[in-house]
Amino acid sequence: RFECQGSGKCCVSRDSYGFVYLSNIDLKRFSKFFKLSLKAFKKKYCQITDGFIHLAEKDELKGNCIFLKDKMCTVYKSRPSQCRTWPFWNDNMNTKVWNKDISVNCPGVGKGKLISQKKINQILKEDLDTEKSILKSRIIPLK
């Protein structure tokens, strides 16, 4: 069972989770949402670490998402795939991880309707496809 409770807990840093990585699809979706060119969106809201584009981190936010305001996602309808697929990430589909971390920190676990195995598999596929896309779009600096 899972239903998002809108707690914003998945958007705050707990030291074990880091960047919100962005695929090309995510970048285009955000650019459209903000009515900015890709270049302008990247300049205003992104950083590159180890060749990967991710949402910028601000020191004053202590690792929390830049789009989290009053425990609410201000870009929910255009949120990136990494956020859309939470908590059904491939890395989380381990009973130990799920029981020790995910179910403890995500109040939506165990709430709402039962999510079918078919739906979970679709989400896992989206997560995997996004990871592949992000890896393929890595920016390798010239030496």
Where are these regions (language model features)?
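Short loop/turn segments that flank or connect secondary-structure elements
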Residues: 1-143
